[in-house]
Protein backbone atom coordinates (compact mmCIF):
# COMPACT_ATOMS: atom_id res chain seq x y z
CA UNK A 1 0.00 0.00 0.00
CA UNK A 2 1.13 3.61 -0.59
CA UNK A 3 3.14 5.31 2.15
CA UNK A 4 3.81 8.99 2.73
CA UNK A 5 6.83 8.96 0.40
CA UNK A 6 6.28 6.14 -2.09
CA UNK A 7 4.33 6.72 -5.30
CA UNK A 8 4.22 3.27 -6.83
CA UNK A 9 2.54 3.14 -10.22
CA UNK A 10 1.34 -0.40 -9.58
CA UNK A 11 -0.94 0.90 -6.81
CA UNK A 12 -1.44 4.63 -7.30
CA UNK A 13 -4.23 5.83 -9.61
CA UNK A 14 -2.38 7.65 -12.42
CA UNK A 15 -3.72 6.24 -15.71
CA UNK A 16 -6.71 8.14 -17.11
CA UNK A 17 -9.39 5.82 -18.50
CA UNK A 18 -12.98 6.04 -19.63
CA UNK A 19 -15.41 3.71 -17.89
CA UNK A 20 -18.43 2.05 -19.52
CA UNK A 21 -20.48 5.24 -19.12
CA UNK A 22 -17.82 7.39 -20.78
CA UNK A 23 -16.77 9.07 -17.53
CA UNK A 24 -13.08 9.64 -16.80
CA UNK A 25 -11.45 7.72 -13.98
CA UNK A 26 -7.91 7.23 -12.76
CA UNK A 27 -6.57 3.75 -12.17
CA UNK A 28 -3.28 2.17 -11.20
CA UNK A 29 -1.52 -0.40 -13.38
CA UNK A 30 -2.94 -3.27 -11.34
CA UNK A 31 -6.40 -1.67 -11.30
CA UNK A 32 -6.26 -1.40 -15.09
CA UNK A 33 -5.69 -5.14 -15.42
CA UNK A 34 -8.20 -6.12 -12.72
CA UNK A 35 -10.97 -3.90 -14.05
CA UNK A 36 -10.11 -4.28 -17.75
CA UNK A 37 -13.43 -5.96 -18.71
CA UNK A 38 -15.32 -2.90 -17.44
CA UNK A 39 -12.99 -0.15 -18.62
CA UNK A 40 -12.90 1.45 -22.04
CA UNK A 41 -10.30 3.58 -23.75
CA UNK A 42 -7.16 4.85 -22.05
CA UNK A 43 -7.34 8.63 -22.22
CA UNK A 44 -4.93 11.41 -21.36
CA UNK A 45 -4.07 15.06 -21.78
CA UNK A 46 -3.23 14.30 -25.44
CA UNK A 47 -4.16 11.22 -27.53
CA UNK A 48 -0.55 10.10 -27.92
CA UNK A 49 -0.33 9.73 -24.15
CA UNK A 50 -2.84 6.88 -24.31
CA UNK A 51 -0.86 5.18 -27.09
CA UNK A 52 2.34 5.25 -25.03
CA UNK A 53 0.63 3.99 -21.86
CA UNK A 54 -1.14 1.14 -23.68
CA UNK A 55 2.22 -0.05 -25.01
CA UNK A 56 3.61 0.11 -21.47
CA UNK A 57 0.74 -2.09 -20.26
CA UNK A 58 1.33 -4.50 -23.14
CA UNK A 59 5.01 -4.84 -22.19
CA UNK A 60 3.99 -5.57 -18.59
CA UNK A 61 1.37 -8.12 -19.64
CA UNK A 62 3.70 -9.93 -22.06
CA UNK A 63 6.28 -10.33 -19.30
CA UNK A 64 3.72 -11.27 -16.65
CA UNK A 65 2.41 -14.23 -18.64
CA UNK A 66 5.72 -14.91 -20.42
CA UNK A 67 3.79 -15.15 -23.67
CA UNK A 68 1.43 -15.87 -25.25
CA UNK A 69 3.47 -18.64 -26.81
CA UNK A 70 1.15 -19.27 -29.75
CA UNK A 71 -2.36 -18.74 -31.11
CA UNK A 72 -3.80 -21.53 -28.96
CA UNK A 73 -2.63 -19.89 -25.74
CA UNK A 74 -3.93 -16.56 -27.02
CA UNK A 75 -7.32 -18.12 -27.73
CA UNK A 76 -7.56 -19.32 -24.12
CA UNK A 77 -6.92 -15.77 -22.94
CA UNK A 78 -9.53 -14.41 -25.37
CA UNK A 79 -12.20 -16.85 -24.19
CA UNK A 80 -11.57 -16.17 -20.49
CA UNK A 81 -13.75 -13.66 -18.65
CA UNK A 82 -10.80 -11.74 -17.27
CA UNK A 83 -7.06 -11.36 -17.66
CA UNK A 84 -4.77 -13.88 -15.86
CA UNK A 85 -4.68 -11.88 -12.64
CA UNK A 86 -2.77 -14.39 -10.53
CA UNK A 87 0.17 -14.34 -12.93
CA UNK A 88 -0.05 -10.55 -13.20
CA UNK A 89 0.13 -10.16 -9.41
CA UNK A 90 2.99 -12.66 -9.13
CA UNK A 91 4.98 -10.66 -11.67
CA UNK A 92 4.09 -7.38 -9.97
CA UNK A 93 5.58 -8.66 -6.71
CA UNK A 94 8.86 -9.39 -8.51
CA UNK A 95 9.23 -5.97 -10.14
CA UNK A 96 7.42 -3.80 -7.57
CA UNK A 97 10.45 -1.75 -6.40
CA UNK A 98 11.10 -0.51 -9.95
CA UNK A 99 7.69 1.16 -10.27
CA UNK A 100 8.21 3.77 -7.54
CA UNK A 101 8.20 7.15 -9.27
CA UNK A 102 10.42 8.73 -6.60
CA UNK A 103 12.70 5.88 -5.55
CA UNK A 104 16.09 7.22 -4.47
CA UNK A 105 18.08 4.61 -6.42
CA UNK A 106 15.97 3.47 -9.38
CA UNK A 107 12.96 5.76 -9.92
CA UNK A 108 10.58 4.54 -12.62
CA UNK A 109 11.76 5.46 -16.15
CA UNK A 110 14.33 7.86 -14.63
CA UNK A 111 17.96 8.19 -13.54
CA UNK A 112 18.25 8.98 -9.83
CA UNK A 113 21.65 10.67 -10.07
CA UNK A 114 20.95 12.69 -13.22
CA UNK A 115 22.26 16.25 -12.97
CA UNK A 116 23.95 18.96 -14.99
CA UNK A 117 27.21 20.72 -14.17
CA UNK A 118 25.21 23.65 -12.79
CA UNK A 119 22.48 21.50 -11.22
CA UNK A 120 19.79 23.14 -13.36
CA UNK A 121 16.19 21.98 -13.37
CA UNK A 122 13.94 22.93 -16.29
CA UNK A 123 10.30 23.92 -16.25
CA UNK A 124 7.57 21.38 -16.82
CA UNK A 125 6.92 22.70 -20.33
CA UNK A 126 9.87 20.51 -21.37
CA UNK A 127 7.66 17.43 -21.11
CA UNK A 128 4.09 18.79 -21.07
CA UNK A 129 3.15 18.34 -24.73
CA UNK A 130 -0.04 20.41 -24.71
CA UNK A 131 2.05 23.57 -24.34
CA UNK A 132 2.86 24.32 -28.00
CA UNK A 133 6.56 24.84 -28.70
CA UNK A 134 7.13 25.45 -25.00
CA UNK A 135 5.14 28.68 -25.13
CA UNK A 136 2.64 28.90 -22.25
CA UNK A 137 0.98 31.95 -23.84
CA UNK A 138 -0.55 29.81 -26.60
CA UNK A 139 -2.36 27.23 -24.48
CA UNK A 140 -5.48 27.03 -22.37
CA UNK A 141 -3.29 25.70 -19.56
CA UNK A 142 -2.66 28.41 -16.96
CA UNK A 143 0.85 29.49 -16.01
CA UNK A 144 0.15 28.37 -12.45
CA UNK A 145 -0.65 24.85 -13.64
CA UNK A 146 2.82 24.63 -15.19
CA UNK A 147 4.52 25.52 -11.93
CA UNK A 148 3.32 22.30 -10.29
CA UNK A 149 1.52 19.19 -11.47
CA UNK A 150 0.43 16.24 -9.39
CA UNK A 151 2.51 13.08 -9.38
CA UNK A 152 -0.05 11.17 -11.45
CA UNK A 153 0.09 13.67 -14.30
CA UNK A 154 3.89 13.76 -14.07
CA UNK A 155 3.93 9.97 -14.54
CA UNK A 156 1.77 10.25 -17.65
CA UNK A 157 4.04 12.89 -19.18
CA UNK A 158 7.13 10.88 -18.23
CA UNK A 159 5.93 7.86 -20.22
CA UNK A 160 4.91 10.15 -23.07
CA UNK A 161 8.31 11.88 -23.16
CA UNK A 162 10.18 8.63 -23.74
CA UNK A 163 7.78 7.77 -26.56
CA UNK A 164 7.13 11.12 -28.28
CA UNK A 165 9.56 13.80 -27.05
CA UNK A 166 10.69 16.07 -29.92
CA UNK A 167 14.30 16.18 -31.02
CA UNK A 168 16.44 19.25 -30.38
CA UNK A 169 19.07 20.28 -27.86
CA UNK A 170 18.64 18.75 -24.39
CA UNK A 171 20.26 19.36 -21.03
CA UNK A 172 23.82 18.08 -20.84
CA UNK A 173 24.01 15.39 -18.17
CA UNK A 174 27.21 14.99 -16.18
CA UNK A 175 28.63 11.57 -16.98
CA UNK A 176 27.43 11.51 -20.58
CA UNK A 177 30.58 11.57 -22.74
CA UNK A 178 28.62 12.87 -25.75
CA UNK A 179 27.72 16.16 -24.05
CA UNK A 180 29.53 19.16 -25.52
CA UNK A 181 29.62 22.56 -23.88
CA UNK A 182 26.99 21.55 -21.36
CA UNK A 183 24.53 20.54 -24.09
CA UNK A 184 23.13 17.30 -25.39
CA UNK A 185 22.87 17.59 -29.15
CA UNK A 186 19.88 16.19 -31.11
CA UNK A 187 19.48 12.42 -31.46
CA UNK A 188 15.93 12.40 -32.86
CA UNK A 189 12.43 12.10 -31.47
CA UNK A 190 11.09 9.42 -29.18
CA UNK A 191 10.63 6.07 -30.89
CA UNK A 192 6.81 6.23 -31.07
CA UNK A 193 7.12 9.69 -32.60
CA UNK A 194 8.81 8.10 -35.60
CA UNK A 195 5.81 5.82 -36.24
CA UNK A 196 2.41 6.14 -37.82
CA UNK A 197 0.71 4.52 -34.85
CA UNK A 198 -1.96 1.88 -35.56
CA UNK A 199 -3.57 0.19 -32.55
CA UNK A 200 -6.76 -1.91 -32.73
CA UNK A 201 -9.30 -1.39 -29.96
CA UNK A 202 -11.96 -3.75 -28.70
CA UNK A 203 -15.19 -3.33 -26.78
CA UNK A 204 -13.27 -2.81 -23.52
CA UNK A 205 -9.71 -2.53 -22.24
CA UNK A 206 -9.39 -6.30 -21.82
CA UNK A 207 -10.18 -6.86 -25.50
CA UNK A 208 -7.88 -4.02 -26.57
CA UNK A 209 -4.93 -5.46 -24.67
CA UNK A 210 -5.51 -8.96 -26.01
CA UNK A 211 -5.96 -7.81 -29.61
CA UNK A 212 -2.48 -6.30 -29.37
CA UNK A 213 -0.92 -9.19 -27.43
CA UNK A 214 0.90 -10.79 -30.36
CA UNK A 215 2.16 -14.31 -29.73
CA UNK A 216 5.81 -15.33 -29.90
CA UNK A 217 5.45 -17.73 -32.82
CA UNK A 218 4.95 -15.05 -35.50
CA UNK A 219 8.56 -13.97 -35.95
CA UNK A 220 7.99 -13.49 -39.66
CA UNK A 221 6.45 -10.12 -38.89
CA UNK A 222 6.78 -9.43 -35.14
CA UNK A 223 9.72 -10.52 -33.00
CA UNK A 224 8.59 -10.44 -29.40
CA UNK A 225 9.41 -12.06 -26.08
CA UNK A 226 12.92 -13.33 -26.77
CA UNK A 227 15.52 -13.87 -24.07
CA UNK A 228 16.77 -10.26 -24.09
CA UNK A 229 13.49 -8.59 -25.07
CA UNK A 230 12.77 -7.13 -21.65
CA UNK A 231 11.56 -3.74 -20.37
CA UNK A 232 13.81 -1.35 -18.42
CA UNK A 233 12.36 -2.38 -15.07
CA UNK A 234 13.98 -5.81 -15.54
CA UNK A 235 17.39 -4.38 -16.44
CA UNK A 236 20.01 -2.61 -14.39
CA UNK A 237 19.03 1.05 -13.93
CA UNK A 238 20.31 3.37 -16.63
CA UNK A 239 23.04 5.88 -15.91
CA UNK A 240 23.45 9.31 -17.51
CA UNK A 241 25.34 7.96 -20.51
CA UNK A 242 23.30 7.01 -23.54
CA UNK A 243 23.77 4.50 -26.32
CA UNK A 244 23.71 5.27 -30.02
CA UNK A 245 24.31 1.79 -31.32
CA UNK A 246 22.30 -0.65 -29.19
CA UNK A 247 19.90 -2.54 -31.48
CA UNK A 248 16.38 -3.11 -30.16
CA UNK A 249 15.87 -6.68 -29.02
CA UNK A 250 12.18 -7.02 -29.74
CA UNK A 251 8.78 -5.39 -29.50
CA UNK A 252 8.77 -5.22 -25.68
CA UNK A 253 12.05 -3.32 -25.82
CA UNK A 254 10.55 -0.88 -28.32
CA UNK A 255 7.30 -0.44 -26.37
CA UNK A 256 9.42 0.91 -23.48
CA UNK A 257 12.43 2.37 -25.33
CA UNK A 258 14.29 4.89 -23.17
CA UNK A 259 14.82 7.71 -25.66
CA UNK A 260 15.63 10.16 -22.88
CA UNK A 261 17.31 10.28 -19.51
CA UNK A 262 14.93 11.99 -17.10
CA UNK A 263 14.68 13.04 -13.49
CA UNK A 264 11.51 14.54 -12.06
CA UNK A 265 11.92 17.22 -9.40
CA UNK A 266 9.29 16.66 -6.73
CA UNK A 267 7.57 14.04 -4.63
CA UNK A 268 4.17 12.41 -4.25
CA UNK A 269 2.70 15.80 -3.29
CA UNK A 270 3.62 17.34 -6.63
CA UNK A 271 6.28 17.81 -9.31
CA UNK A 272 7.70 21.26 -10.02
CA UNK A 273 10.40 20.64 -12.64
CA UNK A 274 12.26 18.13 -14.75
CA UNK A 275 15.73 17.40 -16.04
CA UNK A 276 15.48 16.08 -19.60
CA UNK A 277 18.61 14.74 -21.28
CA UNK A 278 19.35 12.50 -24.25
CA UNK A 279 18.79 8.78 -23.93
CA UNK A 280 19.21 5.86 -26.31
CA UNK A 281 19.20 6.87 -29.96
CA UNK A 282 17.28 4.65 -32.36
CA UNK A 283 17.11 4.69 -36.15
CA UNK A 284 13.89 3.69 -37.95
CA UNK A 285 15.31 1.72 -40.89
CA UNK A 286 14.06 -1.87 -41.23
CA UNK A 287 12.38 -2.26 -37.84
CA UNK A 288 9.32 -3.85 -39.49
CA UNK A 289 9.96 -7.21 -37.81
CA UNK A 290 10.10 -5.55 -34.38
CA UNK A 291 7.34 -2.97 -34.01
CA UNK A 292 3.81 -4.13 -34.91
CA UNK A 293 2.03 -0.81 -34.41
CA UNK A 294 2.80 0.96 -37.70
CA UNK A 295 2.66 0.35 -41.43
CA UNK A 296 5.94 0.45 -43.35
CA UNK A 297 6.84 1.92 -46.74
CA UNK A 298 9.59 0.97 -49.15
CA UNK A 299 12.16 3.80 -49.37
CA UNK A 300 14.10 4.04 -52.62
CA UNK A 301 16.52 6.74 -51.32
CA UNK A 302 17.27 4.75 -48.16
CA UNK A 303 17.66 1.53 -50.16
CA UNK A 304 20.19 3.21 -52.43
CA UNK A 305 22.03 4.69 -49.45
CA UNK A 306 22.34 1.38 -47.59
CA UNK A 307 22.58 -0.77 -50.75
CA UNK A 308 19.80 -3.07 -49.56
CA UNK A 309 16.02 -3.05 -49.33
CA UNK A 310 14.96 -0.57 -46.65
CA UNK A 311 11.52 0.00 -45.18
CA UNK A 312 10.65 3.07 -43.11
CA UNK A 313 7.65 3.68 -40.83
CA UNK A 314 4.66 5.01 -42.77
CA UNK A 315 3.86 8.12 -40.77
CA UNK A 316 0.46 9.82 -40.92
CA UNK A 317 -0.13 12.94 -43.01
CA UNK A 318 -2.42 15.33 -41.09
CA UNK A 319 -3.50 16.82 -44.43
CA UNK A 320 -4.73 13.48 -45.83
CA UNK A 321 -7.71 11.59 -44.46
CA UNK A 322 -6.72 8.26 -42.94
CA UNK A 323 -9.25 6.29 -44.99
CA UNK A 324 -7.57 7.34 -48.23
CA UNK A 325 -4.40 5.53 -47.13
CA UNK A 326 -6.16 2.34 -46.08
CA UNK A 327 -4.28 0.14 -48.58
CA UNK A 328 -1.07 0.48 -46.57
CA UNK A 329 -2.88 -0.74 -43.44
CA UNK A 330 -4.52 -3.86 -44.85
CA UNK A 331 -2.64 -7.18 -44.84
CA UNK A 332 -5.04 -8.28 -47.58
CA UNK A 333 -3.37 -5.65 -49.80
CA UNK A 334 0.05 -5.09 -48.21
CA UNK A 335 0.59 -8.41 -46.45
CA UNK A 336 3.88 -9.45 -44.91
CA UNK A 337 4.10 -12.84 -46.64
CA UNK A 338 5.92 -11.99 -49.84
CA UNK A 339 8.39 -13.99 -51.88
CA UNK A 340 12.02 -14.13 -50.87
CA UNK A 341 13.90 -11.13 -52.20
CA UNK A 342 10.71 -9.36 -53.26
CA UNK A 343 9.84 -5.85 -52.14
CA UNK A 344 6.51 -4.10 -52.23
CA UNK A 345 5.42 -0.53 -51.71
CA UNK A 346 3.93 -1.05 -48.24
CA UNK A 347 3.95 -3.58 -45.42
CA UNK A 348 0.84 -3.63 -43.26
CA UNK A 349 1.16 -3.22 -39.47
CA UNK A 350 2.17 -6.50 -37.86
CA UNK A 351 -0.67 -6.29 -35.36
CA UNK A 352 -3.26 -6.21 -38.17
CA UNK A 353 -1.54 -9.12 -39.92
CA UNK A 354 -1.80 -10.92 -36.57
CA UNK A 355 -5.56 -10.29 -36.35
CA UNK A 356 -6.01 -11.43 -39.95
CA UNK A 357 -4.16 -14.66 -39.18
CA UNK A 358 -6.24 -15.24 -36.03
CA UNK A 359 -9.34 -14.90 -38.18
CA UNK A 360 -7.99 -17.27 -40.84
CA UNK A 361 -7.32 -19.89 -38.15
CA UNK A 362 -10.76 -19.52 -36.61
CA UNK A 363 -9.49 -18.02 -33.34
CA UNK A 364 -11.29 -14.72 -33.94
CA UNK A 365 -14.82 -14.53 -35.33
CA UNK A 366 -15.14 -13.27 -38.90
CA UNK A 367 -17.91 -10.95 -37.72
CA UNK A 368 -15.62 -9.13 -35.28
CA UNK A 369 -15.08 -5.43 -36.07
CA UNK A 370 -12.29 -3.76 -34.05
CA UNK A 371 -11.97 -0.01 -34.08
CA UNK A 372 -8.47 0.74 -35.29
CA UNK A 373 -7.02 3.80 -33.58
CA UNK A 374 -4.64 5.78 -35.76
CA UNK A 375 -2.28 8.07 -33.83
CA UNK A 376 0.92 9.95 -34.39
CA UNK A 377 2.78 13.20 -34.04
CA UNK A 378 3.87 15.57 -36.78
CA UNK A 379 6.88 17.61 -35.77
CA UNK A 380 8.04 21.04 -36.87
CA UNK A 381 11.40 22.21 -38.17
CA UNK A 382 14.18 19.65 -37.54
CA UNK A 383 11.62 17.68 -35.48
CA UNK A 384 12.41 19.98 -32.56
CA UNK A 385 8.81 20.97 -31.78
CA UNK A 386 5.36 19.46 -31.95
CA UNK A 387 3.40 20.65 -34.96
CA UNK A 388 0.26 18.53 -34.83
CA UNK A 389 -1.09 15.38 -33.21
CA UNK A 390 -3.03 12.98 -35.43
CA UNK A 391 -5.87 10.98 -33.88
CA UNK A 392 -8.48 9.05 -35.85
CA UNK A 393 -10.46 5.81 -35.71
CA UNK A 394 -11.44 3.42 -38.50
CA UNK A 395 -13.81 0.46 -38.08
CA UNK A 396 -12.07 -2.48 -39.78
CA UNK A 397 -13.86 -5.80 -39.96
CA UNK A 398 -11.33 -8.59 -39.53
CA UNK A 399 -12.33 -10.00 -42.93
CA UNK A 400 -10.51 -7.01 -44.42
CA UNK A 401 -7.28 -8.18 -42.79
CA UNK A 402 -6.98 -11.70 -44.19
CA UNK A 403 -4.05 -12.05 -46.57
CA UNK A 404 -5.31 -15.52 -47.54
CA UNK A 405 -8.71 -14.10 -48.56
CA UNK A 406 -8.09 -10.61 -49.95
CA UNK A 407 -11.35 -9.89 -51.79
CA UNK A 408 -12.92 -7.69 -49.08
CA UNK A 409 -9.72 -5.71 -48.59
CA UNK A 410 -9.41 -5.28 -52.34
CA UNK A 411 -12.95 -3.89 -52.45
CA UNK A 412 -12.10 -1.37 -49.72
CA UNK A 413 -9.01 -0.30 -51.66
CA UNK A 414 -10.93 0.00 -54.94
CA UNK A 415 -13.55 2.15 -53.22
CA UNK A 416 -10.83 4.63 -52.29
CA UNK A 417 -9.62 4.57 -55.90
CA UNK A 418 -13.19 5.36 -57.02
CA UNK A 419 -13.24 8.41 -54.75
CA UNK A 420 -9.83 9.58 -55.93
CA UNK A 421 -10.75 9.17 -59.61
CA UNK A 422 -13.83 11.30 -59.05
CA UNK A 423 -11.61 13.72 -57.11
CA UNK A 424 -9.54 14.15 -60.27
CA UNK A 425 -12.68 14.71 -62.33
CA UNK A 426 -14.10 17.33 -59.98
CA UNK A 427 -10.67 18.99 -59.79
CA UNK A 428 -10.70 19.32 -63.59
CA UNK A 429 -14.25 20.68 -63.59
CA UNK A 430 -13.46 23.41 -61.07
CA UNK A 431 -10.21 24.30 -62.86
CA UNK A 432 -11.96 24.53 -66.23
CA UNK A 433 -14.60 26.90 -64.86
CA UNK A 434 -11.93 29.04 -63.21
CA UNK A 435 -9.84 29.21 -66.39
CA UNK A 436 -12.94 29.94 -68.48
CA UNK A 437 -13.39 33.03 -66.31
CA UNK A 438 -9.77 34.09 -66.87
CA UNK A 439 -7.87 32.44 -64.01
CA UNK A 440 -4.41 31.00 -64.46
CA UNK A 441 -3.97 27.21 -64.49
CA UNK A 442 -3.85 25.54 -61.08
CA UNK A 443 -5.42 28.55 -59.40
CA UNK A 444 -6.51 26.52 -56.39
CA UNK A 445 -10.15 26.12 -57.41
CA UNK A 446 -9.62 22.46 -58.25
CA UNK A 447 -7.85 21.71 -54.98
CA UNK A 448 -10.69 23.25 -52.98
CA UNK A 449 -13.37 21.30 -54.85
CA UNK A 450 -11.50 18.02 -54.49
CA UNK A 451 -11.03 18.53 -50.75
CA UNK A 452 -14.75 19.31 -50.44
CA UNK A 453 -15.47 15.95 -52.02
CA UNK A 454 -13.13 14.06 -49.70
CA UNK A 455 -14.62 15.81 -46.69
CA UNK A 456 -18.13 14.89 -47.86
CA UNK A 457 -17.09 11.22 -48.20
CA UNK A 458 -15.34 10.99 -44.82
CA UNK A 459 -18.30 9.72 -42.78
CA UNK A 460 -19.98 7.74 -45.60
CA UNK A 461 -16.81 5.75 -46.27
CA UNK A 462 -16.42 4.80 -42.61
CA UNK A 463 -20.07 3.71 -42.42
CA UNK A 464 -19.76 1.75 -45.67
CA UNK A 465 -16.50 0.14 -44.53
CA UNK A 466 -18.01 -0.99 -41.23
CA UNK A 467 -20.68 -2.93 -43.15
CA UNK A 468 -18.19 -5.09 -45.04
CA UNK A 469 -18.49 -8.51 -43.44
CA UNK A 470 -18.06 -12.20 -44.26
CA UNK A 471 -21.44 -12.44 -46.02
CA UNK A 472 -21.32 -9.11 -47.87
CA UNK A 473 -22.02 -9.08 -51.61
CA UNK A 474 -18.81 -7.25 -52.51
CA UNK A 475 -19.85 -6.31 -56.04
CA UNK A 476 -23.11 -4.92 -54.69
CA UNK A 477 -21.25 -3.04 -51.96
CA UNK A 478 -18.90 -1.51 -54.53
CA UNK A 479 -21.84 -0.41 -56.69
CA UNK A 480 -23.52 1.13 -53.64
CA UNK A 481 -20.31 3.01 -52.82
CA UNK A 482 -20.09 4.37 -56.36
CA UNK A 483 -23.65 5.68 -56.02
CA UNK A 484 -22.68 7.36 -52.74
CA UNK A 485 -19.70 9.06 -54.42
CA UNK A 486 -21.86 10.10 -57.37
CA UNK A 487 -24.41 11.72 -55.05
CA UNK A 488 -21.67 13.52 -53.12
CA UNK A 489 -20.56 15.38 -56.25
CA UNK A 490 -23.93 17.04 -56.87
CA UNK A 491 -23.89 19.81 -54.23
CA UNK A 492 -20.27 20.62 -55.05
CA UNK A 493 -20.81 20.91 -58.81
CA UNK A 494 -24.08 22.80 -58.32
CA UNK A 495 -22.24 25.35 -56.19
CA UNK A 496 -19.45 25.70 -58.74
CA UNK A 497 -21.97 26.34 -61.51
CA UNK A 498 -24.04 28.74 -59.41
CA UNK A 499 -21.00 30.80 -58.41
CA UNK A 500 -19.37 30.82 -61.84
CA UNK A 501 -18.49 34.31 -63.04
CA UNK A 502 -20.41 35.67 -66.07
CA UNK A 503 -17.22 35.48 -68.12
CA UNK A 504 -17.06 31.74 -67.51
CA UNK A 505 -20.37 31.23 -69.34
CA UNK A 506 -19.00 32.92 -72.45
CA UNK A 507 -15.70 31.16 -71.92
CA UNK A 508 -12.42 31.48 -73.75
CA UNK A 509 -10.18 29.45 -76.00
CA UNK A 510 -7.56 27.41 -74.18
CA UNK A 511 -5.12 25.29 -76.19
CA UNK A 512 -7.34 25.60 -79.29
CA UNK A 513 -10.50 24.51 -77.43
CA UNK A 514 -13.39 26.67 -76.31
CA UNK A 515 -13.91 26.21 -72.57
CA UNK A 516 -17.01 27.50 -70.81
CA UNK A 517 -19.29 26.30 -68.02
CA UNK A 518 -21.54 24.21 -70.26
CA UNK A 519 -18.66 22.44 -71.98
CA UNK A 520 -16.83 21.92 -68.68
CA UNK A 521 -19.97 20.28 -67.28
CA UNK A 522 -20.22 17.91 -70.23
CA UNK A 523 -16.57 16.94 -69.83
CA UNK A 524 -17.08 16.39 -66.12
CA UNK A 525 -20.13 14.16 -66.60
CA UNK A 526 -18.21 12.05 -69.11
CA UNK A 527 -15.29 11.74 -66.67
CA UNK A 528 -17.71 10.87 -63.87
CA UNK A 529 -19.23 8.04 -65.87
CA UNK A 530 -15.79 6.65 -66.64
CA UNK A 531 -14.80 6.86 -62.96
CA UNK A 532 -18.04 5.27 -61.69
CA UNK A 533 -19.03 2.69 -64.29
CA UNK A 534 -21.23 0.72 -61.88
CA UNK A 535 -23.68 3.61 -61.44
CA UNK A 536 -24.92 3.74 -65.04
CA UNK A 537 -25.26 1.64 -68.16
CA UNK A 538 -23.16 2.42 -71.22
CA UNK A 539 -26.28 3.45 -73.17
CA UNK A 540 -26.68 6.48 -70.94
CA UNK A 541 -23.87 8.36 -72.68
CA UNK A 542 -25.32 11.27 -74.59
CA UNK A 543 -24.47 12.24 -78.12
CA UNK A 544 -22.79 15.40 -76.85
CA UNK A 545 -20.59 13.41 -74.45
CA UNK A 546 -19.52 11.17 -77.33
CA UNK A 547 -18.72 14.22 -79.38
CA UNK A 548 -16.33 15.63 -76.80
Task: Map each language-model feature to its residues.
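Short functional micro-motifs and their immediate structural scaffolds
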Residues: 155-158
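Short Cys/His-rich metal-coordination motifs, predominantly Zn2+-binding knuckles/fingers
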Residues: 150-153, 265
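Flanking scaffold residues of small Cys/His-coordinated metal-binding clusters
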Residues: 145
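Extended alpha-helical scaffolding segments
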Residues: 1-133, 160, 166, 170-171, ...
Amino acid sequence: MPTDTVFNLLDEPWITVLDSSGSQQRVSILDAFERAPWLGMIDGEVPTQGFAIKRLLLAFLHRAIDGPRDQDEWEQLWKADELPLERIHDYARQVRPRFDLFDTEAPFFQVASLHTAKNEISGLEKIVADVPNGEPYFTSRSAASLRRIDAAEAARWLVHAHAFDPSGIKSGAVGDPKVKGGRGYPIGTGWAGQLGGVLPQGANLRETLLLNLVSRDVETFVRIGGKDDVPPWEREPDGPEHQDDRPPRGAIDLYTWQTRRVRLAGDRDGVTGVLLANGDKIQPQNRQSLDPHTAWRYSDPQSKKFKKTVYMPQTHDPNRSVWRGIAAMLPSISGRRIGSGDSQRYLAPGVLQWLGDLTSEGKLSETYVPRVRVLGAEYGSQSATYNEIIDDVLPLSVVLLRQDSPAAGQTAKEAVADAENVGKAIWGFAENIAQAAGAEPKSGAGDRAREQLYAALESPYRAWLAELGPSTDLAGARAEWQRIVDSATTPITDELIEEAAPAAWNGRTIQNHLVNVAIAEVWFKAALRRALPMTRTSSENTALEKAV
